[in-house]
Amino acid sequence: MTSTRKLSVSCLIVFMVSSLIAVSSGWLSIGKIAIKDGKCDPKNGNLYAIGEKWYNDEDCFEITCIQGDKGSVAQQVASCPVHAVKPGCELVFPGGTYPKCCPYYECPNS
């Protein structure tokens, strides 16, 4: 198998796996965050050690302070799955803390 073909197959597998994760478990992203004393500093008045979680109830996120590349610190953000529109159903936003705050459809005949 040529290296171009291997790369294409690898990219397809990664896309398929990430699509399954996104549909079944919501979205997971990793990004930069301010660091203070080797801890995550989300500018909310608290510092979080690697492995600690905190929540953004307004946007329904779970955030985890993680070890990044080359000793850096990063944040991993988990959010709700995206739902396709269901005609005749009502999208409910229950509130609370992730994952209980994730929206869901309530359908009259289900």
Swiss-Prot record:
Organism: Ethmostigmus rubripes (Giant centipede)
Molecular function terms, GO-annotated: toxin activity
Pfam families, per database record: SVWC
Primary subcellular site in the record, as a coarse category: secreted
Top-level taxon of the source organism: Eukaryota
Record's subcellular location: Secreted
This protein's name: U-scoloptoxin(16)-Er6a
Keyword Transport: no
Keywords for this protein: Disulfide bond, Secreted, Signal, Toxin
